[in-house]
Structures are given as C-alpha cells and as structure tokens.
Amino acid sequence: MRAAHDEVVREHGRITNMKRTLLHSPPAFHALMEWYALRDTVQPFLGERLVSLFSHAISTENDCLVCSTFFRQIITESGEDPDRFKLDEREEAVVEFGRRLAKPFARVPNELFARLAATFSDEQIVALTAFGALMVATNVFNNALDVDLDGYLDPYRKDEATPAKGTA
C-alpha cells in the first residue's frame, strides 16, 4: 500500500480523500486509476476543455459532490463559468453523451449516436464510452462511500451543494 501511495504522490502531487479511500484496496485503486489512461487516450481528440466538460456533465448528472466540484474547479480556473459555458455542436453532442451515460441503463438515442459517429471514429467512440463509464464508476464510489470533499475544493462547491459527511 505504501508503494501505491508514493506512486500517487509522484504522479498526481497529492493524495485526495477519494484516492486515500481507494488505497484501502489496491485492486480497487488500480481499477479506478485507469481513468487517467483513458483520459490520456481521449484528450488528443477531445482536447483538455472537452474532457473536463464531459466529466463534469457525468458527475453533475450523478450528483457526485467530489467529482463535480473537482471539475468545477478546472472549468473555473480556465476562465469559464461552470454553470454557463458555450458549446458548439460537437461539444454539445459529447456533453449530452456524458449525461446519457450517467442515466440509468445509459441508453443513447440513435440521433445522438449519429452525431457522435459523424465526428468520431469507432475507436474514439469506444474509448470515450469507456472513459465515461469509469467516470460513472468513480462517481458511484464517492457517493456510495460518502467520501468527503477535499478542503481545497470547498471554494468551488456549487452554492446549493451540501457538504459530504462521510468518514471514508
């Protein structure tokens, strides 16, 4: 466990409450940390901004305080308002796809899939879907264990968001 802890600090600079909780089970930690590998796969064709907007859409739809606030921070620090950002058609399709992945049964209407298929290859859509699925899994993990929001994220909390009160 110590080696995994040191690796997180080396790669990500800090141990968040979520990562600290995940480190109780190294296989669980490694499974959810594949999020980073998938992010690195989709970022070249989405761009940093759309990766954050996609992840924020999923996390907001799932009402995950930890993840939605994390992405609110990224969006805010990039100079945008996380509650009022402008999207072009491509971005709109990707953000809507994220919201759909977060809904029960993750059904994606044919029309939305056609919009994605017009822009992305099959390989890219598969990577985007897997990335979104890991984002959903991360949301479920944080919500199920009521992982506390990290203090550094408090200023980015959405006004009506209630503090997490878990012990994890």
What is the role of each PLM region?
Residues M1-A168:
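Hydrophobic alpha-helical segments
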